Amino acid sequence: MTSEQLLAEIREANLTYLMLAQTLIRQDKAEAVFRLGLNEEAADILASLSAAQVLKLASRNTLLCSFRVDDELVWSLLTSHNTPRKAASEATNTLHANILMASRVSEVL
């Protein structure tokens, strides 16, 4: 992949993220704040952006979104890495990971 292709992919990801964020915020702000990991002020700003502003923001060369999962424990739980593959175990691991990520969202708010 060339650097131009990579930049085009980043811009497309930015546009997709911004459009999804606006849709979620406009449908249910409280749920969007939780799912996107944003505070209410950022959600209000995103919801109020015009199409031209969204396109301008999306054209940046850096990703506007980031992974919420930033530690090995959550990644291991989500991927069942280094654990036996059992349905009940996977469900428990996913639940545990969701609880950990939800607690981190409350820290942002």
Swiss-Prot record:
Keywords: Activator, Bacterial flagellum biogenesis, Cytoplasm, Disulfide bond, DNA-binding, Transcription, Transcription regulation. Its main location: cytoplasm. GO terms for molecular function: DNA binding. One of its GO terms (biological process) is positive regulation of DNA-templated transcription. InterPro entries: Flagellar_FlhD, FlhD_sf. It is found in: Cytoplasm. The keyword Cytoplasm applies. One of its GO terms (cellular component) is cytoplasm. It comes from the Bacteria. Functions in complex with FlhC as a master transcriptional regulator that regulates transcription of several flagellar and non-flagellar operons by binding to their promoter region. Activates expression of class 2 flagellar genes, including fliA, which is a flagellum-specific sigma factor that turns on the class 3 genes. Also regulates genes whose products function in a variety of physiological pathways. NCBIfam families: PRK02909.1-1. Belongs to the FlhD family. Homodimer; disulfide-linked. Forms a heterohexamer composed of two FlhC and four FlhD subunits. Each FlhC binds a FlhD dimer, forming a heterotrimer, and a hexamer assembles by dimerization of two heterotrimers. The C-terminal region contains a putative helix-turn-helix (HTH) motif, suggesting that this region may bind DNA. This is Flagellar transcriptional regulator FlhD. It comes from Acidovorax sp. (strain JS42). The gene is flhD.
